Amino acid sequence: MKIKELTNEEFMVFQEHFPVSSPYQTSEYAMTMNKQEYDSFYLGMYDDNNILIAASLIMVELLGKFRYAYAPRGFLIDYNNENHVKEFTKLVKKDLRQKNIIAIKISPLIIKSIYTKKDGIITAPNFENIYNLLKDLDYYHLGYNNYFEAIKPRYEAIIDLNPNTSLMFSDISKNYRTKIRASDRIGIRIYKGDENYLPLLYKLTKKKYPRNLEYLKSLYNYYKNKNMIDLYFALLDTKRYLINIQKEYQEQNIKCAKVTDDIFKNQGKASNSLIAKKIIEDNKLEILKRQLIHATQLLQQSPDGIIVASAIMVKQQKEVYLILDGYDVNYKSVNAKHLLIWKLMEKYAKEGYEKFNLGGISNPLLENNKYKGLNN
């Protein structure tokens, strides 16, 4: 076996035909990170017949006076093939040593277990063998984490898409379905955007992701060249929103009037339950009144609508990845992100994609999980 540096084209061809890979193992991602002042190169192992067997995107970062390499999501290799893993590791170490790189860090796509509400925890049968193999090759395991301590998340939420979108919708939790319907009813509309919307996406995500606007621009433009990226946003239709609030206010007004009428009809013998009901209905009316005033102001200030959520998706093989998403916290109550995610699931399911990767989450089985709300 031999190792060599691959050209961008050689790596791209190998990666595109490799059975399982991540957007972070692509030349597009490498070029994006180059714009963030990281160096990168590709290594490939081939046999005597010049057939490429394994490859890796290597990014180099300064660590004081030293340099170390990082392979995001690990090598493009069959980790079940012990001989290939051993040989590739040996050759990579030798190559990096010649480049005065002191270490390599990987976050490989090796599944330890799968958790579903239906089946519970399903342990991957080959994980322990792969784990022990890597340890024997002097890879140092940094330990299991429950939250977001690693460069790439330990846990990912992945949804199996179903072209029967009605059935897929029925599998969503009742609470989530209610929010989706409510968001659609009050006037949230989903639209496809382009690079002109990147500054807005950055504004919505800058507190959540440690990336700058130039990163978003590079990411979008490199993946766009191969039609691998989509940007969508949720717009609050302020006119429709006002109409909906007006309707709810009128309906609530009728309810309040009816309760008041019931009390007058039963003067002197009005039950405590009727009085309590009136207080509850009046409070609801007061809330709607404030919402009505706010909705009127929104229409006056933003007659063309307000963008309240946005997301970037990368399409790779049969899977779609939610790379970045964000929403305006001032409009959290309209549940725009819920509708946006559902509409994207629906769209990609109809296009034949099989999985929807929502990205990193915290440990779903951890008690007293401080990030539990982010998993919902």
Task: State each model region's role.
Residues F66-E149, K315-N376:
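Acyl-donor binding region in acyl/amide transferases
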Residues P153:
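Active-site neighborhood for divalent-cation/phosphate handling
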Residues M1-K2:
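Extreme N-terminal starter segment of soluble prokaryotic enzymes
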Residues E5-N49, A54-K65, Y139-A150, D160-N164, ...:
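A conserved beta-strand-loop-helix scaffold within acyl/acetyltransferase catalytic domains
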